[in-house]
UniProtKB/Swiss-Prot annotation:
Its main location: membrane. It comes from Klebsiella pneumoniae (strain 342). Belongs to the fluoride channel Fluc/FEX (TC 1.A.43) family. Coiled coil: none annotated. Keywords: Cell inner membrane, Cell membrane, Ion channel, Ion transport, Membrane, Metal-binding, Sodium, Transmembrane, Transmembrane helix, Transport. This is Fluoride-specific ion channel FluC. It comes from the Bacteria. Na(+) binds at G75, T78.
Amino acid sequence: MFQLLCAVFIGGGTGSVLRWWLGMKLNPVHHAIPIGTLTANLVGAFVIGAGLAWFNRLTDIDPMWKLLITTGFCGGLTTFSTFSAEVVFLLQQGRVSWALLNVMVNLLGSFAMTAVAFWLFSQAASR
């Protein structure tokens, strides 16, 4: 049990640090859309899709790796709370169109990245 806890802890810490770094580097790039948060959410969606596809096919992998990557890393990297706060901030500034675009791109982009990665890695794992 302690090993599993450590796997989630290490993955979560790594994902959180990467999310912070992406925000620091990429959020200033655009005046209205927080590109760092979007990147973190899209990358996390892709990684979890790929991970789930691999873990579905390769059942002999230690469950610790699934926890480290999906629950830990992706859980630390992706962020619904920051995304929500950024949308509220845009709404408070009267930037309704930007807020709606941000919601649409984050949600649809995350769904698409998860589906594409799952499909790609399912195909690769079946070969």
